[in-house]
């Protein structure tokens, strides 16, 4: 969400559906503890039955202003467009690296949400679980935090901040290729 995919502000928009209820957390507050529930009026009206919901921080004007400010920065600084252009640049760079290293079975993603699937054997698509852990730790040693995902924990998950730029992408690509060259 929040434009990370570049092409869409919300991930569900890619599927052409509108959910009945949407929950937001963490990113909307940019470090400030804030979460949001968004729903359709007919669903919200069901809760208007005389029972009062109370929360000490519900509707806090400071929190609401922070959420509005975060959305404003995303729009004003064109961070969704940045996610698209820098994400495409990073994806292209990763696909070029994929052509050099058999351990990379697939590179996929959209915007600044990218996965790199590591495999031991291209013919049998055996997940490279131990190797994925090695890459995550080696990237951490270079000051880059990525994580593992997928049912076999062999997919490197790359979700940099929305302000990630081409210079950051170049550093990531150089570091990633150096790790692969040294480790495999």
Whereabouts are the PLM-identified features?
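Conserved N-terminal phosphate-binding loop of PLP-dependent enzymes in the Aspartate aminotransferase
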Residues: 1-184
């Amino acid at each position: 969400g929040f434009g990370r995919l570049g092409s869409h502000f919300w991930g569900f928009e890619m599927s052409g559906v509108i959910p009945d209820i949407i929950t937001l957390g963490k990113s909307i507050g940019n470090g400030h503890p804030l979460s949001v529930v968004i729903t359709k009026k007919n669903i919200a009206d069901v809760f208007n039955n005389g029972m009062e919901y109370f929360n000490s921080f519900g509707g806090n004007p400071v929190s609401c202003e922070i959420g509005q400010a975060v959305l404003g920065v995303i729009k004003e600084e064109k961070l969704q467009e940045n996610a698209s252009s820098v994400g495409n640049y990073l994806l292209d760079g990763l696909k070029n690296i994929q052509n050099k290293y058999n351990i990379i079975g697939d590179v996929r993603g959209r915007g600044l949400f990218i996965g790199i699937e590591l495999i031991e054997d291209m013919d049998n698509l055996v997940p490279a679980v131990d190797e994925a852990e090695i890459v995550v730790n080696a990237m951490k040693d270079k000051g880059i935090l990525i994580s593992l995902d997928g049912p076999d924990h062999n997919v490197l998950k790359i979700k940099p901040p929305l302000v990630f730029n081409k210079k950051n992408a170049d550093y990531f690509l150089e570091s990633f290729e150096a790790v692969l060259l040294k480790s495999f």
